[in-house]
Amino acid sequence: MTTDDDMRMWDDEAATFDEAADHGLRDPAVRAAWRDLLLSVLPPAPGRVADLGCGTGTLALLLADEGYVVDCVDFSPEMVRLARAKTGDRTDLTCVEADAAAPPLESGAYDVVLCRHVLWALPDQVAVLRRWVDLLAPGGRLVLVEGNWTTGAGLTADATLTLLEEAGRPGVVRHLPEPAYWGREITDERYLVLA
């Protein structure tokens, strides 16, 4: 579970969160890169997606625009408020204020569980992964986008694969060094895991 201090930190970050090229996807080229990446690993739409730790809902909205039905979860009230403002009254996208580590979503109901830059920040990561896998329908896909940043935060790809093995869900890594995803050159490790 996450703490009140964590929640306040992300509430404070919410107003400027989308300024990062890979968060707001405001640059059409960055948005197109993420669209193409996600569509290459997701089953064809329509499908049901749980976007856990959704932030301001940018990826959820991108996927809803592609024909997916998306339930997004974030524990930051301010992030959820901004996500709801972006998504309006769409019927293909809902935003829930809750902890991504223990989302109040139906087991076995999702074709995809998507988490971007979330797992690294959570305690008891193996238990969290097991819960996320429990949300998947038969044949469902767990898609994790993580990194090991120069700030010292994050998880290496190898560490993420080990956690997935411990959770009983082996994965495959695709490294993402291309500036197209981040809006700039990067020197840290960033990757997607499909499990």
Region spans (language model):
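Conserved beta-strand signature within the Rossmann-like core of class I S-adenosyl-L-methionine
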Residues: G140-G147
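A short glycine-rich, Lys/Arg-flanked "PGG" loop and its adjoining helix->strand segment in the class I
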Residues: V126-P138
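Class I SAM-dependent methyltransferase SAM/SAH-binding core
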Residues: R48-L52, T56-P103
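Conserved S-adenosyl-L-methionine
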Residues: P170-A180
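A short acidic, Gly/Pro-enriched loop at the edge of an enzyme's catalytic core
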Residues: A101-V112
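Conserved class I S-adenosyl-L-methionine
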Residues: M1-A45, T151
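A short SAM/SAH-binding and catalytic strip from SAM-dependent methyltransferases
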Residues: V112-Q125
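Short alpha-helix
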Residues: A153-G168
